[in-house]
């Protein structure tokens, strides 16, 4: 049963009535039952949740609760479900009973419709209604009506499908509060959104019977019917997830409550169902008002409908306020400082893209399970992942598959080849279970590609478990990208980074021959990025901006700008002002945060440079801004700004060539370089092109057509380590210059002298730019502007300048080979500390004999003993202590107070000053002359003269002598000196008094032998014992331990003598016999010192004893008493030592190769220096390596005669002149010189080219053969001089650049040409008159075969013959054709002057000519005999005569034909290369294969520019003209089929047509259908029209060449740059100047994008022989898989056909692309870097005639690699 239309009409009227009643509601806090749509418009204020409501029958009072519930009444027999009760007064059971009663009672009102009493505030900060306008309200009403109708239809359908009649009752509906719905216009849409839970009551207001329930919108978080909708108070914070906000206000619906950390559980239901998680997902989005997704109004019905709705609309995009309509949010990654995570979502997308290979909505939504993370996935657990979804993005359905994948990739995961490798795999394998619904966020495609780029060498042929192309992109998918944070950006950002790749629309790249790659900006160019991708949030405090630009207009334009997020204010930028009066400003735009309009921080005015390439840079350093123009500081101005730096807003824009909407002025012109550097320093290395050592520049960067121009790089003074910077040199002020004081401080000036390039340059380098002629005045502006003029003549030598002030001490050269130079002698240093004790000296001389001892008692006479052994040496005595001695003589010069080595700045005159003055002592005495000093280093560059001359000035006066250096610090103790000489014997001391006798002590037991004690003092003599009876003489005893009679035995030595004790003097008894030796007695106490006895008589000197053995050192004795002061010794007199050996070589200073001329040649002779002390003798150094020959230095003034001093100071003779040195190496070629003056009149030129064929003359009477050829005619007079030819191109060779050479000597007789075929001997005929036919009739008749005919009668004059067809050059004789199209303009040359010269020597005999047989004309009247013709070398011959015609009457004499003997005609280009040496200089060569004309020149040949081809007209009746010219074979070999052009083949003149090493094309076998010639005779096949093999193009039209490399390559090409470089090399080798790049896709480029956009649609693709392969580049990618023209050939750079030559056995070509030219990342041999068998690359078979056939082949194969010319460039731009 269909729904009743009347009921539907009533429903619509009810809705309209409700809409009209809304504004009439006076109480915003009440809700009328007649106003069911009041929730469509939120009230202005809402602070209470309670309010009056009409109470229906059988309803309960509505209770306000904090936990609102959803009440759903089952329909059609469905299970009745409800949630937790909202009121404590009604338990669930009672509430259920109430509902049942309401449904079963007599009242027709069935299910209750809970309506919120009061709408809560939409936001705590919202004070007023966010009105979207009347249009939004109308759209809401219309949407509600549409949902009502849909609800009614579905209700009727459900009721009838159940088989029962549904009464008129309202469907249970949940109405959201007014504040929980927010709308925002988006185009023509209004989006409604539920942002919070829905308060309801089971006993809320219901509608009456017979009416429909109020329609409602299905919330995006619609839950299961039993799921309590708990609302988190804040978005959860999970690792790697960024919950984004798109709110435009500052309000937050989250409050300050703690977010939940785990997914919410249901009682017994596990995790939240899918719909409940959807609510969590969207609440986390922190949505307020600006929502970018349209959510349709859906009815709340039963499960199947909910499931179907959620499958389509359940996954809603996270909204964004980004202007592009896409979400782009940056969040920090926990635990990884300096990273950012980007979540990207489309404006209306719902997850992954449709073509994604990952698990889609179906696999990750309907069957998703949240499981605990397996313990084996520790890699992911470290990232904070505890639970993960299955199935994951790799379609794994259980943990076993996940663990197997981790185990398979375990080794790769531990390589750490990418800083976020673990994040990538965990996002794929174990997506974290969050409060949001599945599918979770997968990694972005860019994330995958970045990982592949970093880890490709670790994959080793394997691939990632996911194809990067299957992942969503940042632009079109909802994904995660983790990359480096903006705070980790490089210190320099270049132009390519700022523009992006690919280039934006309306910005094109060109290769400028002077500056290289440049980018063209027009009025429609548009480039913009987010600034935080390249710069940190807090921009650099000090920085520099470098530009290389060429403005095209005089209008103002912004070069670079960083704007705020609204693009209203330029925070940082550079702008060129409009040109006025030949001047323009360069302004630095710098706006502090908070300003309402753009501010100008600094501005500089300088001459306009429109149309000129100009280098300039802005350096922001502290409180100043400096402008550098062409690498020279132009001006510096103060700059006031805040101290905290420039803070960029979130979403700040970055623009090149414009400023977005912040400034309407766009830059128009070209930009070659733009750099933003973190350092404020600007040096020549920075502001000039510093990418000379690039990095892989192949033809893709500069292209093979890029002409590397020689740039004059300035010298970087930092290459000389440690050399002091010269002080700033300024030009003298001129009239008109500003006198404004430089605002820089002294410290700034000093820094600028070192860090900036200033206005000074090294000698000879000059400065480049448009302001070279202008006078530079740093800090005061540019005084004189204008273009750079020619270099002036050197100025006159100026007078010597005055002596400069004494400069400060410079730095020290830290060179390992430097040698200190002795300075002036300083004062003597303070006395050092006493040295260590020296080694013991030798024994002294024997002392004087001592006093006679007392006569002892006469003992018994013993036997003489044997000589005793030498005793041990005694210990050294303690040193004496006496008063301080007088000061010693001055010592040698001490070491320098600096530890590093000295240089020229430490020599005399270096000028120390400052604190060193306080250390200086009194002036010492002048020392002897010192040795010659080392050569000095080059001085500072002199200031420029007024006239700008760079010639060196005269040498300055010598500087004043420097101050003496300070005294040196005390040196370290020296090593022990050698033993001194023996001193004289000392004076004997006085004899001491006798001491008292000590009391003997008790006798102790015998102890062990103790160590030898110190010598004691002499004791008193003991009492003599009784004399015993003499015993018998004993035998001689053994040698005793006697002591040598030396120093120890003298008086006072302190060593006791072992003697027997004596008793008191008794009577002398008889001699007794010697007794036995007794034990040693106890040593007595030391006795008192005895008195000094009187001097005894001098005894007889005893014999010297033997030297005793060295004893072991004894213990140190006690300190003795101070000895008496000795007399001073005599001064030693020593002779001066011998001169020391030669000192080490002088300091070696590192210099660059450009400075060798300054250092390696002797400088000017200086004045003799002050004599110094002789330096210490140093060790002889090793022989150094031979230095390179330096360039001659500037000639200095002649110095005074010098004097050479010897090391000891003596003056030697004058220096002698040395032997003549060897000649130096040849210097490099100099720069190109300027054009020279007009030359003098040259010698006569060579004969000109033969003229065009003349008109066909009337046939003359046959000549008389009797005259024959017995005599040669006389040479005719010389012709008039020809017109002046164009000037020749300058020839550049490796030795020099020659502008114009002198005329050479006349050439010798050329080589005789090959003789023609021998013809039949004919009879001599009479000489005939010269006709107008442009061939040699004599030679023609000589070759004709026939009998002599009789002389005919004089016939009547015949009619004039029909005019011939337009001329065909060498193949026919006719009048000239119509003029062709205008040719390319030639190079203008100076007007030439010439004189008539003598005739040249006769050339060699040329080969036979070629031609066609003409039609026979009517006989003409006989003519009189003509004069003989010119000699043979000046005739044009025809090797194939026509049949003889009938004799006719004699005709009038014709004019002399043109000479054509100096032309060689060859069939192929290779033949010309083989035989070009046989052709004399000045001859022409015509190559039939190419239809090109060349001229033989000295050491080569040159191509001749021809006019446009004029096609032969059809339908003239001329059979010869209508036929294809026959193939001509004039040499041994196989010919090619000639191509017929119906249009011009003229190319513009180009210098690269001259090949230094022209290619040698291999001789080919003829193609099928072409006869093979075995001789040099001309072969004439039957004349018939032929067609060329392939379509050809017109040479004057733009074309793109497709050429193959000379060898096949495998997949390992060293990347796309390696393949590009081979295309570049081989193209240059054969003289092709275009930009050739490999016909390959790679990671960074699609094959389709290689060719310039402007040349893709209309420029044909041709091969090396200009045969058309494809109509255009676009046609290759039009779906035909790169279909080529039928019969197309592809040649290599060396001219071989790759389809027929065996060098390419496999006729396939690599391309790595799909049919549309997009890169196939899974099939390009790992970015063309591997040749393993397992890797594959996309290839195509050329046998099928296609270039983009889809065939995956192993990278181990060697296939053809093609090179495509990526842009058409005229010859003038190459």
Swiss-Prot record:
<keyword id="KW-0130">Cell adhesion</keyword>
<feature type="glycosylation site" description="N-linked (GlcNAc...) asparagine">
    <location>
        <position position="354"/>
    </location>
</feature>
<dbReference type="GO" id="GO:0005615">
    <property type="term" value="C:extracellular space"/>
</dbReference>
<feature type="signal peptide">
    <location>
        <begin position="1"/>
        <end position="26"/>
    </location>
</feature>
<feature type="region of interest" description="Disordered">
    <location>
        <begin position="681"/>
        <end position="1458"/>
    </location>
</feature>
<dbReference type="GO" id="GO:0062023">
    <property type="term" value="C:collagen-containing extracellular matrix"/>
</dbReference>
<feature type="domain" description="Collagen-like 2">
    <location>
        <begin position="953"/>
        <end position="1007"/>
    </location>
</feature>
<feature type="domain" description="Collagen-like 4">
    <location>
        <begin position="1066"/>
        <end position="1117"/>
    </location>
</feature>
<keyword id="KW-0272">Extracellular matrix</keyword>
<feature type="domain" description="Laminin G-like">
    <location>
        <begin position="522"/>
        <end position="704"/>
    </location>
</feature>
<keyword id="KW-0379">Hydroxylation</keyword>
<feature type="compositionally biased region" description="Low complexity">
    <location>
        <begin position="809"/>
        <end position="824"/>
    </location>
</feature>
<dbReference type="GO" id="GO:0101023">
    <property type="term" value="P:vascular endothelial cell proliferation"/>
</dbReference>
<feature type="disulfide bond">
    <location>
        <begin position="370"/>
        <end position="433"/>
    </location>
</feature>
<feature type="compositionally biased region" description="Polar residues">
    <location>
        <begin position="55"/>
        <end position="87"/>
    </location>
</feature>
<feature type="binding site">
    <location>
        <position position="1595"/>
    </location>
    <ligand>
        <name>Zn(2+)</name>
    </ligand>
</feature>
<feature type="binding site">
    <location>
        <position position="1591"/>
    </location>
    <ligand>
        <name>Zn(2+)</name>
    </ligand>
</feature>
<feature type="region of interest" description="Non-collagenous domain 1 association domain">
    <location>
        <begin position="1474"/>
        <end position="1519"/>
    </location>
</feature>
<feature type="region of interest" description="Nonhelical region 5 (NC5)">
    <location>
        <begin position="1149"/>
        <end position="1162"/>
    </location>
</feature>
<keyword id="KW-0325">Glycoprotein</keyword>
<dbReference type="InterPro" id="IPR008160">
    <property type="entry name" value="Collagen"/>
</dbReference>
<feature type="region of interest" description="Triple-helical region 9 (COL9)">
    <location>
        <begin position="1377"/>
        <end position="1428"/>
    </location>
</feature>
<feature type="compositionally biased region" description="Low complexity">
    <location>
        <begin position="951"/>
        <end position="963"/>
    </location>
</feature>
<feature type="region of interest" description="Triple-helical region 8 (COL8)">
    <location>
        <begin position="1346"/>
        <end position="1369"/>
    </location>
</feature>
<dbReference type="InterPro" id="IPR013320">
    <property type="entry name" value="ConA-like_dom_sf"/>
</dbReference>
<feature type="disulfide bond">
    <location>
        <begin position="1725"/>
        <end position="1755"/>
    </location>
</feature>
<feature type="region of interest" description="Triple-helical region 2 (COL2)">
    <location>
        <begin position="823"/>
        <end position="896"/>
    </location>
</feature>
<dbReference type="GO" id="GO:2000353">
    <property type="term" value="P:positive regulation of endothelial cell apoptotic process"/>
</dbReference>
<dbReference type="InterPro" id="IPR001791">
    <property type="entry name" value="Laminin_G"/>
</dbReference>
<feature type="binding site">
    <location>
        <position position="1593"/>
    </location>
    <ligand>
        <name>Zn(2+)</name>
    </ligand>
</feature>
<feature type="compositionally biased region" description="Pro residues">
    <location>
        <begin position="1418"/>
        <end position="1431"/>
    </location>
</feature>
<feature type="region of interest" description="Triple-helical region 6 (COL6)">
    <location>
        <begin position="1218"/>
        <end position="1290"/>
    </location>
</feature>
<dbReference type="GO" id="GO:0043534">
    <property type="term" value="P:blood vessel endothelial cell migration"/>
</dbReference>
<dbReference type="GO" id="GO:0072577">
    <property type="term" value="P:endothelial cell apoptotic process"/>
</dbReference>
<keyword id="KW-0176">Collagen</keyword>
<feature type="domain" description="Collagen-like 1">
    <location>
        <begin position="823"/>
        <end position="878"/>
    </location>
</feature>
<feature type="disulfide bond">
    <location>
        <begin position="380"/>
        <end position="426"/>
    </location>
</feature>
<dbReference type="GO" id="GO:0001886">
    <property type="term" value="P:endothelial cell morphogenesis"/>
</dbReference>
<dbReference type="InterPro" id="IPR016186">
    <property type="entry name" value="C-type_lectin-like/link_sf"/>
</dbReference>
<feature type="region of interest" description="Triple-helical region 10 (COL10)">
    <location>
        <begin position="1442"/>
        <end position="1459"/>
    </location>
</feature>
<keyword id="KW-0479">Metal-binding</keyword>
<feature type="compositionally biased region" description="Basic and acidic residues">
    <location>
        <begin position="708"/>
        <end position="717"/>
    </location>
</feature>
């Amino acid at each position: 049963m269909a729904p009743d239309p009347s009921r539907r009409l009533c429903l619509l009227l009810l809705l309209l009535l409700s809409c009209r009643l809304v504004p009439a509601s006076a109480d915003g806090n009440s809700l009328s039952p007649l106003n069911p749509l009041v929730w469509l418009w939120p009230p202005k204020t809402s602070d209470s949740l309670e309010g009056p409501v009409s109470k229906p029958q059988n309803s309960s009072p509505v209770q306000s609760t904090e936990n609102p519930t959803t009440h759903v009444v089952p329909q059609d027999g469905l299970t009745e479900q409800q949630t937790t009760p909202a009121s404590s007064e009604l338990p669930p059971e009672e509430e259920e009973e109430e509902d049942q009663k309401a449904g079963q009672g007599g009242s027709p009102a069935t299910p209750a419709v809970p309506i919120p009493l009061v709408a809560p505030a939409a936001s705590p900060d919202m004070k007023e209604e966010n009105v979207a306008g009347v249009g939004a309200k109308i759209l809401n009403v219309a949407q509600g009506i549409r949902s009502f109708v849909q609800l009614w239809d579905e209700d009727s359908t459900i009721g009838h499908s159940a088989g029962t009649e549904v009464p008129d009752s309202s469907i249970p509906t949940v109405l959201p509060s007014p504040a929980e719905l927010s709308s925002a216009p988006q185009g023509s849409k209004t989006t409604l959104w539920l942002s919070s839970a829905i308060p309801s009551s089971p006993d809320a207001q219901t509608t009456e019977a017979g009416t429909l329930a109020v329609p409602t919108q299905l919330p995006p978080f619609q839950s299961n019917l039993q799921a309590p909708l708990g609302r988190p108070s804040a978005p959860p914070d999970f690792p790697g997830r960024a919950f984004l906000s798109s709110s435009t206000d500052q309000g937050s619906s989250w409050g300050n409550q703690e977010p939940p950390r785990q997914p919410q559980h249901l009682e017994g239901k596990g995790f939240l169902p899918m719909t409940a998680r959807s609510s969590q997902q969207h609440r986390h989005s922190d949505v307020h008002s600006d929502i970018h997704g349209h959510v349709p109004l859906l009815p709340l019905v039963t499960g199947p409908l909910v499931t179907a709705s959620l499958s389509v609309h359940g996954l809603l995009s996270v909204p964004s306020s980004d202007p592009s309509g896409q979400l782009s949010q940056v969040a920090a990654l926990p635990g990884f400082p300096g990273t950012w995570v980007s979540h990207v979502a489309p404006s209306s997308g719902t997850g992954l893209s449709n073509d994604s290979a990952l698990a889609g909505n179906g696999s990750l939504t309907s069957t998703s399970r949240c499981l605990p993370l397996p313990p084996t996935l520790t890699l992911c657990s470290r990232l904070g992942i505890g639970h993960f979804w299955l199935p994951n993005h790799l379609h794994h359905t259980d943990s076993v598959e996940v663990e197997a994948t981790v185990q398979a990739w375990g080794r790769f995961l531990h390589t750490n080849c990418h800083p976020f490798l673990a994040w990538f795999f965990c996002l794929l394998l174990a997506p974290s279970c969050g409060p949001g619904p599945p599918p979770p966020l997968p990694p972005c495609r860019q994330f995958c590609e970045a990982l592949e780029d970093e880890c490709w060498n670790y994959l080793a042929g394997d691939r990632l478990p996911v194809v990067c192309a299957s992942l969503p992109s940042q632009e079109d998918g909802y994904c995660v990208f983790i990359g480096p944070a903006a705070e980790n950006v490089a210190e320099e950002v270049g132009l390519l980074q700022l523009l992006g790749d690919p280039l934006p629309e309306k910005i094109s790249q060109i290769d400028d021959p002077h500056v290289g790659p440049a980018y063209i900006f027009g009025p429609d160019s548009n480039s913009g990025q987010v600034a935080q991708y390249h710069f940190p949030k807090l921009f650099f405090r000090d920085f520099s901006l470098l530009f290389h630009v060429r403005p095209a207009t005089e209008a103002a334009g912004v070069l670079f700008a960083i704007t705020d997020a609204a693009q209203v204010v330029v925070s940082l930028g550079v702008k060129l002002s409009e040109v006025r009066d030949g001047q323009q400003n360069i302004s630095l735009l710098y706006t502090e945060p908070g300003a309402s309009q753009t501010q100008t921080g600094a501005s500089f005015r300088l001459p306009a440079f429109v149309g000129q390439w100009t280098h300039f840079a802005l350096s922001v350093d502290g409180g100043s801004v400096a402008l550098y123009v062409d690498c020279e500081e132009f001006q510096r101005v103060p700059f006031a700004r805040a101290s905290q730096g420039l803070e960029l807003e979130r979403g700040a824009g970055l623009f090149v060539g414009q400023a977005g909407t912040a400034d309407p002025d766009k830059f128009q012109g070209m930009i070659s370089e733009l750099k933003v550097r973190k350092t404020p320093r600007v040096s020549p290395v920075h502001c000039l092109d510093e990418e000379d050592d690039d990095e892989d520049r192949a033809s893709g960067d500069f292209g093979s057509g890029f002409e590397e121009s020689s740039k004059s790089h300035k010298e970087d003074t930092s290459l000389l380590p440690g050399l002091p910077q010269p002080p700033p040199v300024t030009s003298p002020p001129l009239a008109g210059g500003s006198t404004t004081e430089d605002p820089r401080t002294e410290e700034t000036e000093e820094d600028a002298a070192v860090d900036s390039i200033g206005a000074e340059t090294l000698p000879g380098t000059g400065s480049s730019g448009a302001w070279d002629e202008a006078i530079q005045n740093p800090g005061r502006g540019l005084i004189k502007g204008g273009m750079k003029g020619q270099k002036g003549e050197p100025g006159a030598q100026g007078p010597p300048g005055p002596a400069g002030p004494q400069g400060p001490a410079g730095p020290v050269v830290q060179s390992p080979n430097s040698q200190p130079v002795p300075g002036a002698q300083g004062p003597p240093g303070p006395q050092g500390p006493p040295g260590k004790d020296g080694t013991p000296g030798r024994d002294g001389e024997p002392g004087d004999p001592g006093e006679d001892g007392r006569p002892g008692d006469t003992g018994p006479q013993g036997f003489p003993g044997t000589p005793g052994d030498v005793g041990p040496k005694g210990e050294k005595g303690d040193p004496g202590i006496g008063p301080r001695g007088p000061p010693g003589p001055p010592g040698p010069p001490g070491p320098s107070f600096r530890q590093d080595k000295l240089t020229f700045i430490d020599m005399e005159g270096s000028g120390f000053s400052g604190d060193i003055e306080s250390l200086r002592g009194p002036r010492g005495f002048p020392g002897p002359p010192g040795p010659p000093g080392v050569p000095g280093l080059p001085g500072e560059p002199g200031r420029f003269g007024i006239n700008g001359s760079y010639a060196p000035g005269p040498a300055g006066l010598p500087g004043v002598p420097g101050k003496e250096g300070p005294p040196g610090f005390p040196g370290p103790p020296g090593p022990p000196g050698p033993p001194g000489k023996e001193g004289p014997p000392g004076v004997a001391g006085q004899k001491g008094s006798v001491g008292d006798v000590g009391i003997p002590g008790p006798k102790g037991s015998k102890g062990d032998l103790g160590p030898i004690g110190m010598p004691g003092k002499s004791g008193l003599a003991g009492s003599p014992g009784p004399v015993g009876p003499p015993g018998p003489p004993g035998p001689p005893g053994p040698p005793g331990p006697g002591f040598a009679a030396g120093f120890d035995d003298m008086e006072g030595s302190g060593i006791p003598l072992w003697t027997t004790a004596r008793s008191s003097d008794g009577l002398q008894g008889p001699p007794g016999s010697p007794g036995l030796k007794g034990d040693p007695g106890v040593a007595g106490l030391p006795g008192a010192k005895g008195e000094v006895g009187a001097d005894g008589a001098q005894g007889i000197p005893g014999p010297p004893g033997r030297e005793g053995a060295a004893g072991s050192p004894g213990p140190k004795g006690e300190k003795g008493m101070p000895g008496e002061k000795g007399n001073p010794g005599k001064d030693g007199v020593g002779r001066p030592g011998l001169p020391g050996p030669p000192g080490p070589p002088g300091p070696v200073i590192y210099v660059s190769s450009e400075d060798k001329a300054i250092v390696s040649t002797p400088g000017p002779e200086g004045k003799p220096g002050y004599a110094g002390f002789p330096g210490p003798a140093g060790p002889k150094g090793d022989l150094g390596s031979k230095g390179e020959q330096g360039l001659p230095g500037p000639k200095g003034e002649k110095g005074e005669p010098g004097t050479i001093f010897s090391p000891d100071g003596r003056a030697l003779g004058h220096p002698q002149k040395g032997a003549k040195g060897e000649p130096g190496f040849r210097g490099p070629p100099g720069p190109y010189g300027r054009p020279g003056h007009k030359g003098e009149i040259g010698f006569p030129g060579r004969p000109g080219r033969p003229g065009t064929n003349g008109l066909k003359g009337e046939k003359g009477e046959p000549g008389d053969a009797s005259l024959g050829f017995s005599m040669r005619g006389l040479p005719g007079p010389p012709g008039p001089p020809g017109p002046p030819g164009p000037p020749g191109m300058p020839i550049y060779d490796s030795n020099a650049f020659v502008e114009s050479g002198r005329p050479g000597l006349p050439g010798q007789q050329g080589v005789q040409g090959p003789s023609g075929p021998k013809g039949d001997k004919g009879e001599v005929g009479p000489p005939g008159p010269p006709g107008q036919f442009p061939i040699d009739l004599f030679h023609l008749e000589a070759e004709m075969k026939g009998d002599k005919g009789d002389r005919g009668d004089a016939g009547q004059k015949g009619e004039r013959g029909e005019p011939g067809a337009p001329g065909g050059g060498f193949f026919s004789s006719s009048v000239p054709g119509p003029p062709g199209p205008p040719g390319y303009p030639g190079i203008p040359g100076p007007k030439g002057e010439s004189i008539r010269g003598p005739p040249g020597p006769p050339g060699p005999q040329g080969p036979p000519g070629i031609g066609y047989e003409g039609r026979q004309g009517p006989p003409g009247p006989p003519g009189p005999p003509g004069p003989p013709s010119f000699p043979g070398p000046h005739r044009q011959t025809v090797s194939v005569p026509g049949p003889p015609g009938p004799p006719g009457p004699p005709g009038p004499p014709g004019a002399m034909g043109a000479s054509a003997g100096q032309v060689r005609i060859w069939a192929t280009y290779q033949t010309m290369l083989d035989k070009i040496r046989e052709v004399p200089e000045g001859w022409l060569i015509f190559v039939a294969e190419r239809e090109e004309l060349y001229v033989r020149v000295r050491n080569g040949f040159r191509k001749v520019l021809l006019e446009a081809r004029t096609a032969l007209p059809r339908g003239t009746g001329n059979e010869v003209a209508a036929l294809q010219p026959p193939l001509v074979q004039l040499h041994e070999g196989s010919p090619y089929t000639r191509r017929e052009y119906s249009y011009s083949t003229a190319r513009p003149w180009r210098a690269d047509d001259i090949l230094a090493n022209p290619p040698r094309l291999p001789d080919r076998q003829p193609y099928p259908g072409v006869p093979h010639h075995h001789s040099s005779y001309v072969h004439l096949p039957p004349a018939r029209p032929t067609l060329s093999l392939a379509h050809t193009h017109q040479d004057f039209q733009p074309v793109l060449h497709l050429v193959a490399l000379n060898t096949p390559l495998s997949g390992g090409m060293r990347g796309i740059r390696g393949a590009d470089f081979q295309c570049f090399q081989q193209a240059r080798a054969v003289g092709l100047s275009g930009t050739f790049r490999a016909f390959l896709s790679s990671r960074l480029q699609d094959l389709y994008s290689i060719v310039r956009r402007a040349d893709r649609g209309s420029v044909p693709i041709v091969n090396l022989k200009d045969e058309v392969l494809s109509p255009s580049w676009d046609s290759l990618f039009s779906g035909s898989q790169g279909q080529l023209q039928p019969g197309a050939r592809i040649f290599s750079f060396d001219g071989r056909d790759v389809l027929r030559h065996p060098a390419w056995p496999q006729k396939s070509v690599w391309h790595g692309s799909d049919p549309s030219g997009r890169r196939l990342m899974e099939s390009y041999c790992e970015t063309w870097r591997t040749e393993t068998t397992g890797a594959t690359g996309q290839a195509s078979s050329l046998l099928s005639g296609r270039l983009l056939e889809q065939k995956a082949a192993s990278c181990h194969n060697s296939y053809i690699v093609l090179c495509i010319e990526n842009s058409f460039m005229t010859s003038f731009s190459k």
